[in-house]
Amino acid sequence: MKAYLALISAAVIGLAACSQEPAAPAAEATPAAEAPASEAPAAEAAPADAAEAPAAGNCAATVESNDNMQFNTKDIQVSKACKEFTITLKHTGTQPKTSMGHNIVIGKTEDMDGIFKDGVGAADTDYVKPDDARVVAHTKLIGGGEESSLTLDPAKLADGEYKFACTFPGHGALMNGKVTLVD
């Protein structure tokens, strides 16, 4: 029995030592980061700046969707400084809109359930009830490889909390996010 306990103790110590291994690759990555200053920082700085730019002053955003019922973002930031704001939806998948169509519909958070319910029977109008006053803006329904845009007045977003979602039946639970008005 003592030998058995000794083996278990050795195994636990061995596993504990193995759990420390992930720290080693991080230490190995440090020398690689010390590449010549003329190449590495310039290449790294440009994408970081580009990712931060869309917040203020940019009056457009692009949202990508795919065949896995996903948007590539959960937050669209709309600048108050814009007179108009354009959102372009790009479907990066390959399936047609009849089986995996996507759109972007913007409405108040509390109105989205009603927008979904009324849109289910509106296949001919891209799953958006015609003339629905709760809908601030929407794109058309698109399939793989297609894109569609909507343009809205940011002032329409000043009162309340807003969401965007895909109203293709069954997609809204996964494909949604916030629309945030920013300075």
UniProtKB/Swiss-Prot annotation:
InterPro entries, A to Z: Azurin, BlueCu_1, BlueCu_1_BS, Cu-binding_ET, Cupredoxin
Cofactor note (record): Binds 1 copper ion per subunit.
Protein name: Outer membrane protein H.8
All residue ranges annotated as the Plastocyanin-like domain in the record: 57-183
Membrane topology annotation: Lipid-anchor
CC terms in the record's Gene Ontology section: cell outer membrane
Lipidation feature positions (N-palmitoyl cysteine): 18
Cofactor: Cu cation
Ranges for region Disordered: 27-51
Keyword Electron transport: yes
